[in-house]
């Protein structure tokens, strides 16, 4: 008997299954009951629930339909192999061998053109093509077995006739393409069958076995090996071929199919079935055996008889009924149609076990209307939160908002636990880092929510697997410095080469200093001094020779690796040697036996085997051996290129099951998969974006099924719509849906998934007052709006962001200029260099010394491209080094710069060297007569009025750049003039004025100017120094807003109107000109003090007090050409 149980709730179906086990125990207590399921997750849930119901769940087997049916073939048909010779993987490898043989034939011109025009290697493209064709053949075997038989008979025109009959209006060009695709696919299939027969005596595929097994079942006298009964649970749809097999078996044993039907009314296709037949169908009521229920309600029947009601696939909607069910339910509707259609010729016992939805909440009303095939306005309560839609600015914000939502739910409902929550996304790998970042850390006093991740790829979740696959894909790598250093972040790899975590900062410093940028070999495309080989030669040479000892065999010792650091340099060299050998190996194609050796050696060469890694290394080794054995079985002897083997191993390793984490007593994060939507109190859907869901799958142009539709065909977007419907119906108390609704860059609105839009339109139809609106969340976690109690349930629990949220940039409390009187230390002495640094940039000094905040405006990453131009820092370094060299040593210096990888390669380097040489020689003329510089110590006391008392401050340190008998301060900068260059010589000169007689005014020399600083009297100099020291002391408690980073003289003015504009310029970058100052940018972004004229006046007054004397007497400036 074929028994179909129709219910809208899995809990009820589970209850029926449990009662069957109790009332009808198996005759043999040792025989396993067979329960077909769609996924291991459904089996896991069912086992747990049956154990709760009966106290135990044992001796149950949960195969997938395809594997179970193949097992039936193997047990009952003698010629059937235990392993399917026509599985997708085997067909792919065979096709890789066969396709090249046929490429010269006229029918195969589309394949020939595809392979020849590929930018990738032809073999890799052949591998991809073979995989696509194998997948297509596998689909034909299940959904179009009649085409397979037509090809085997050589009757290709049968297929094109079927397509033309269903689509008579196809244009001639497309139909010709379909005919061509049919011919080459038929020829390839016939060759595939012959190839399988050469290895296996009987090349029997699933379609042929299907017919043979049906014939066997039709023979009542023939012996058969069948289970005593079969249960089918939690499968939304079965391929027609599988259903036919199970229906045929039902003449021998009982088949119990549990169909999770979202609607208790008939909502399948009506036009293809006779109305009188449908009207006669009855349903038996579970627990009400004396009552039968007709297939149609009275309203439906009346409308049908009056021709008001038509449900067809072509229209994809119901003229009367529930629009959501019509739009999303195609997969279930087709299967329902097939089940009802087959009741006419298959003895079927249909049982209805629908559960009424008792809740009056928005979610309950929605589920109830779907159950009853209704379409009426919903009653939306003002504070109903059973179904909420959330718009965020990014995936990270989606997870943060979800975290707050769940914490709020747990607060409101103490009975709710983490295991009652499932969170499903279109692609769990995309969200994994955000989930781990938000749910994996503790936010102040807020407790962590336990969570588990299912379905993420092993390459995304295991660092050893990820790095192993990275190594396999190094064939086309340019070995950039950053890419290689990332490998050393992997503990198992780092330890294999005896490099510790503490060594990594030094390794990065060496890589930077040795000029490594990209490339493995030094002699790659000419001499590449930025390669790993060149850099490592410098490190190794540096162990014995310092840079000053000159070039040895086109290399230069690296000073920082000199002496005791030689062991680390040797370990790095060992790592490089292994990478270089691997790269060379990957350039060649190899047999599978050789690849087995290479892949195994890769594990031992690059990864340390210890307690943490041994299991995963063993697993990878197992997969390598399985692949090798499989290809040997198929007699695949072609040599494989590295990109193909990398792809194959990736697929092997990513198939690792981790779905057992699905029901682990925690919040379940997983991918939205068929029948993953088992009942949960809280169902959350993330990433419901327009571009991401329903997921798109571009059809192959040679897929013939797309031109010939049959009920039961699987279409990815239709499947996703049904998954969304299942998720909505699986929520028992709450359903939460979120998407990225605004751009994080410009805040422009972005559309949600069309399914979300349809849901919102359906809920709000006919609503006048209370409509369901999308809750829009702030872009940042620290927005003040997140911490306000409101009716939209958006309050944040992340207390770590509360201080920032409470920060008000418009209030006085936000000002950097507030005093910091806590833990004030008494200063009795000031070092000269510290005082100069303070005066040169008082804002930066405050951030770094008082707040401990350091802004870096340069990219810390190592460049990964050839340097056709010199960076500003390299240019400055070269110029200043050459200033101290004699002209006859310039050539050696430039040669060293080339070997160090500083100068651009080839002619570019020569041009740069010539330009630098000319500029340096010109500047050397300006400083040629200075003689040798001297330095002098400074140590004296200053009397400073500060904090309402007179304090004696010791000023001490050293002054350099003193020239001549009179120790004149002369500073030079090999750069264009900037006002701030005057500050150091100015302070030195002030000290000379205070501490010695007849101090000579200081001088500044730059590329474009030579200027003498203004002479001043001792008392004036003392007063000026007292201003600097007093403000230095004051900077302990208050930032000193004196702009020194651009033209200081712009702020020694009496006109206040242009000051705001000049301040704003400090925060702006100007092409190749000055860059924005990060410290001033931060100050001006977080203070409103300069909106008041009195504060601008204060800034001008202080700037004039600091530099009025220095920049007032412009007549002392001299310009030299």
UniProtKB/Swiss-Prot annotation:
Q: List the Pfam families hit by this protein, alphabetically.
A: Exonuc_V_gamma, RecC_C
GO molecular function term, any single one: DNA binding
**What other comment is given for this protein?**
In the RecBCD complex, RecB has a slow 3'-5' helicase, an exonuclease activity and loads RecA onto ssDNA, RecD has a fast 5'-3' helicase activity, while RecC stimulates the ATPase and processivity of the RecB helicase and contributes to recognition of the Chi site.
What cellular component terms from Gene Ontology apply here? exodeoxyribonuclease V complex
Can you say what this protein is called?
RecBCD enzyme subunit RecC
Q: Which gene encodes it?
A: recC
Query: What Gene3D superfamilies does UniProt report for this protein, alphabetically?
Result: 1.10.10.160, 1.10.10.990, 3.40.50.10930, P-loop containing nucleotide triphosphate hydrolases
Segments forming a coiled coil: none
As for family, the record states: Belongs to the RecC family.
Q: How does it assemble?
A: Heterotrimer of RecB, RecC and RecD. All subunits contribute to DNA-binding.
Q: Classify the source by domain of life.
A: Bacteria
Q: Which of UniProt's keywords are assigned here?
A: ATP-binding, DNA damage, DNA repair, DNA-binding, Exonuclease, Helicase, Hydrolase, Nuclease, Nucleotide-binding
| The organism of origin for this protein | Haemophilus influenzae (strain ATCC 51907 / DSM 11121 / KW20 / Rd)
Q: Name one GO biological process term.
A: double-strand break repair via homologous recombination
The protein's job, in short, is:
A helicase/nuclease that prepares dsDNA breaks (DSB) for recombinational DNA repair. Binds to DSBs and unwinds DNA via a highly rapid and processive ATP-dependent bidirectional helicase activity. Unwinds dsDNA until it encounters a Chi (crossover hotspot instigator) sequence from the 3' direction. Cuts ssDNA a few nucleotides 3' to the Chi site. The properties and activities of the enzyme are changed at Chi. The Chi-altered holoenzyme produces a long 3'-ssDNA overhang and facilitates RecA-binding to the ssDNA for homologous DNA recombination and repair.
């Amino acid at each position: 008997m074929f028994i179909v149980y129709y219910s809208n709730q899995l809990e009820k179906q589970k209850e029926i299954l449990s009662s069957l086990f109790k009332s009808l125990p198996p005759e043999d207590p040792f025989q396993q009951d067979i329960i077909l399921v769609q996924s291991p997750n459904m089996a896991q849930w069912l086992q747990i629930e049956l154990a709760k119901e009966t106290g135990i769940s044992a001796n149950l087997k949960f195969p997938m339909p395809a594997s179970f049916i193949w097992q039936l073939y193997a047990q009952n048909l003698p010629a059937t192999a235990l392993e399917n010779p026509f599985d997708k993987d085997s067909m792919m490898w065979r096709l890789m061998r066969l396709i090249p043989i046929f490429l010269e034939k006229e029918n195969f011109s589309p394949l020939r053109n595809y392979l020849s025009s590929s930018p990738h290697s032809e073999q890799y493209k052949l591998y991809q093509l073979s995989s696509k064709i194998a997948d297509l053949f596998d689909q034909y075997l299940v959904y179009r077995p009649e085409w397979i038989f037509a090809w085997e008979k050589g009757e290709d025109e049968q297929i094109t006739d079927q397509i033309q009959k269903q689509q008579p209006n196809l244009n001639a060009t497309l139909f010709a393409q379909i005919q061509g695709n049919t011919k080459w696919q038929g020829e390839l299939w016939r060759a595939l069958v012959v190839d399988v027969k050469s290895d296996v005596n009987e090349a029997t595929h699933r379609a042929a076995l299907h017919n043979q097994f049906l014939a066997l079942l039709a023979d009542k006298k023939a012996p058969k090996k069948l289970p005593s009964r079969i249960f089918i649970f939690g499968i939304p749809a079965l391929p027609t071929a599988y259903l036919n097999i199970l229906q045929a078996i039902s003449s021998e044993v009982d088949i119990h199919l549990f169909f999770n039907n979202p609607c208790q009314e008939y909502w399948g296709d009506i036009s293809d079935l006779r109305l009188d037949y449908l009207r006669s169908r009855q349903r038996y009521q579970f627990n009400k055996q004396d009552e039968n229920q007709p297939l149609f309600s009275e309203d439906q029947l009346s409308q049908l008889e009056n021709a008001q009601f038509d449900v067809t696939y072509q229209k994809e909607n119901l003229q009367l009924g529930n629009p959501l069910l019509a739009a999303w339910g195609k997969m279930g509707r087709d299967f329902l149609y097939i089940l009802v259609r087959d009741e006419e010729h298959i003895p079927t016992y249909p049982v209805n076990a629908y559960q009424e939805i008792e809740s009056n909440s928005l979610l309950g009303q929605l589920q109830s209307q779907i159950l009853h095939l209704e379409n009426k306005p919903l009653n939306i309560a003002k504070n109903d939160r059973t179904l909420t839609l959330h718009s965020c600015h990014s995936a990270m914000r989606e997870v943060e908002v979800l975290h707050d939502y769940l914490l709020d739910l747990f607060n409101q409902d103490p009975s709710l636990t983490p295991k009652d929550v499932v969170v499903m996304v279109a692609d769990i790998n995309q969200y994994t880092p955000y989930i781990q970042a938000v749910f994996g850390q503790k936010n102040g006093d807020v407790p962590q929510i336990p969570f588990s991740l299912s379905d993420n790829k092993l390459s995304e979740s295991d660092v050893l697997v990820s790095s192993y696959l990275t190594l396999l894909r190094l064939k086309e790598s340019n070995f950039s410095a950053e890419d290689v250093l990332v490998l050393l972040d992997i503990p198992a790899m780092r330890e294999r080469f005896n490099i510790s975590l503490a060594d990594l900062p030094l390794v990065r410093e060496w890589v930077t200093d040795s000029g490594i940028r990209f490339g493995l070999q030094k002699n790659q495309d000419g001499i590449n001094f930025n390669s790993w080989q060149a850099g490592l030669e410098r490190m190794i040479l540096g162990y014995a020779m310092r840079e000053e000892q000159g070039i040895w065999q086109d290399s230069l010792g690296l000073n920082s690796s000199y002496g005791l650091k030689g062991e680390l340099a040797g370990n790095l060299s060992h790592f490089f040697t292994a990478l270089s050998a691997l790269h060379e190996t990957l350039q060649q194609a190899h047999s599978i036996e050789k690849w087995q050796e290479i892949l195994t050696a890769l594990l031992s060469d690059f990864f340390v085997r210890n307690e943490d890694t041994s299991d995963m290394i063993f697993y990878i080794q197992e997969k390598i051996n399985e692949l090798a054995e499989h290809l040997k079985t198929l007699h695949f002897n072609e040599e494989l290129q590295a990109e193909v083997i990398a792809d194959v191993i990736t697929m092997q390793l990513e198939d690792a099951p981790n779905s057992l984490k699905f029901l682990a007593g925690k919040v379940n994060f997983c991918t939205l998969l068929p029948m993953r939507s088992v009942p949960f109190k809280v169902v959350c859907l993330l990433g419901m974006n327009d571009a991401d869901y329903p997921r798109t799958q571009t059809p192959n142009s040679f897929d013939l099924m797309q031109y010939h539709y049959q009920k039961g065909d699987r279409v990815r977007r239709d499947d996703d719509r049904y998954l969304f419907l299942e998720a909505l119906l699986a929520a028992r108390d709450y359903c939460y849906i979120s998407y990225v609704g605004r751009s994080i860059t410009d805040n422009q609105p972005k559309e949600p998934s069309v399914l979300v839009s349809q849901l919102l339109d359906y809920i709000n139809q006919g609503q006048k007052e209370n409509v369901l609106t999308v809750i829009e969340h702030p872009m940042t976690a620290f927005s003040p709006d997140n911490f306000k109690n409101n009716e939209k349930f958006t309050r944040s629990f992340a207390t770590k962001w509360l201080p920032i949220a409470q920060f008000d940039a418009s209030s006085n409390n936000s000002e950097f200029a507030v005093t910091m009187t806590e833990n004030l230390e008494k200063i009795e002495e000031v070092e000269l260099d510290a005082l100069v640094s303070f005066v040169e940039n008082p804002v930066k000094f405050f951030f770094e010394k008082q707040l401990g905040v350091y802004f870096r405006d340069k990219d810390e990453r190592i460049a990964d491209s050839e340097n056709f131009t010199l960076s500003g820092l390299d240019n400055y370094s070269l110029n200043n080094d050459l200033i101290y060299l004699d002209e006859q040593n310039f050539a050696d210096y430039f040669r060293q710069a080339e070997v160090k990888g500083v100068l651009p390669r080839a002619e570019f380097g020569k041009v740069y060297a010539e330009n630098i040489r000319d500029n340096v020689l010109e500047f050397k003329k300006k400083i040629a007569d200075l003689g040798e510089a001297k330095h002098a110590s400074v140590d004296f006391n200053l009397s400073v009025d500060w904090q309402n008392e007179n304090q004696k401050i010791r000023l001490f340190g050293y002054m350099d750049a003193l020239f001549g008998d009179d120790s004149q301060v002369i500073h030079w900068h090999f750069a264009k003039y900037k006002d701030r260059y005057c500050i150091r010589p100015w302070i030195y000169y002030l000290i000379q004025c205070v501490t010695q007689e007849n101090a000579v005014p200081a001088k500044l020399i730059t590329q474009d100017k030579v200027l003498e600083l203004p002479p001043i009297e001792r008392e004036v100099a003392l007063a000026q120094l007292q201003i600097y020291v007093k403000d230095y002391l004051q900077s302990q408690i208050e930032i000193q807003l004196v702009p020194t980073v651009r033209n200081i003289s712009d702020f020694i003015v009496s006109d206040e109107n242009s000051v705001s504009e000049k301040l704003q310029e400090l925060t702006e970058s100007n092409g190749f000109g000055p860059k924005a100052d990060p410290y001033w940018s931060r100050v001006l972004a977080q203070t409103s003090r300069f909106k008041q004229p009195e504060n601008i006046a204060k800034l001008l007054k202080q700037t004039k007090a600091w530099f009025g004397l220095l920049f007032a007497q412009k007549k002392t400036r001299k310009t030299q050409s």
